């Protein structure tokens, strides 16, 4: 199957996909489709930043004959990017990893601008760093793309190389820096007291036997 239609559509029927936290991944989660169970690895609501990359590495170790694709934003990917050295070793199975590159912690930046009157701090990432370049220095393939068609083409080639030639590819997708709206507006509201509720109303916790 081709990924031309959405860039993150049906990669292969037997694909395993992992994602990370953040707005980029939340949007990307909408497009993959699956015909079997246990094909999608995601952090869910637990928020373990940096989950996507090591998760897809583990999936490939467990299922070496299955195509795997991980994706993460550049902030989350930076948490676990040290494992680029690991996957560069000859004995490691090949993977394909997509990194959405908007040079910022987008969700956190949007939240702080909402809370603090368009002010933000500590959310910008270094624009001189290229993850594709780091991948090449780690002995694997790194490519940069800047559009959906280019991503689709690069992803097709990367998965083919993964399955036929045992090649690991990191695809760095260059994005604009537009801040998206929070997925839950109610989460950004100021805390309020709930009328009529008192701590004494709650049942005391019991020790676990």
Residue ranges, per PLM feature:
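Short coil/turn segments at secondary-structure boundaries
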Residues: 20-21, 172
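Conserved hydrophobic/aromatic pocket- or pore-lining residues that grip, position, or stack substrates
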Residues: 6, 19, 58
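Single conserved hydrophobic/aromatic residue that forms the stacking wall/gate
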Residues: 1-12
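Short glycine-rich phosphate-binding loop at a beta-alpha junction
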Residues: 14-20
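Conserved acidic residues
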Residues: 9, 15, 168
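Thiamine diphosphate
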Residues: 26-209
């Amino acid at each position: 199957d081709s990924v031309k239609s959405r860039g993150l559509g049906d990669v292969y029927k037997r694909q395993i996909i992992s994602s990370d936290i953040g707005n980029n991944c939340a949007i990307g989660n909408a497009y993959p489709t699956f015909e079997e169970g246990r094909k999608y690895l995601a952090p869910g609501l637990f928020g373990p930043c940096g989950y996507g990359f090591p998760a897809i590495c583990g999936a490939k170790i467990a299922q070496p004959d299955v195509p795997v694709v991980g994706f993460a934003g550049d902030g989350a990917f930076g948490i676990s990017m040290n494992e680029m050295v690991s996957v560069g070793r000859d004995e490691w199975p090949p993977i394909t990893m997509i990194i959405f590159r908007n040079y910022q912690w987008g969700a956190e930046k949007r939240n702080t601008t909402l809370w603090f009157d368009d002010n933000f701090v500590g959310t910008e990432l270094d624009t001189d760093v290229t993850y594709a370049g780091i991948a090449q220095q780690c002995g694997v393939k790194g490519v940069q793309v800047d559009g959906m068609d280019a991503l689709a083409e690069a992803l097709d080639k990367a998965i083919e190389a993964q399955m036929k030639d045992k090649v690991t590819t990191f695809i760095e997708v260059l994005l604009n820096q537009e801040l998206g709206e929070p997925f839950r507006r109610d989460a950004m509201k100021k805390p309020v007291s709930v009328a009529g509720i008192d701590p004494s109303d709650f049942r005391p916790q019991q020790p676990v036997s």
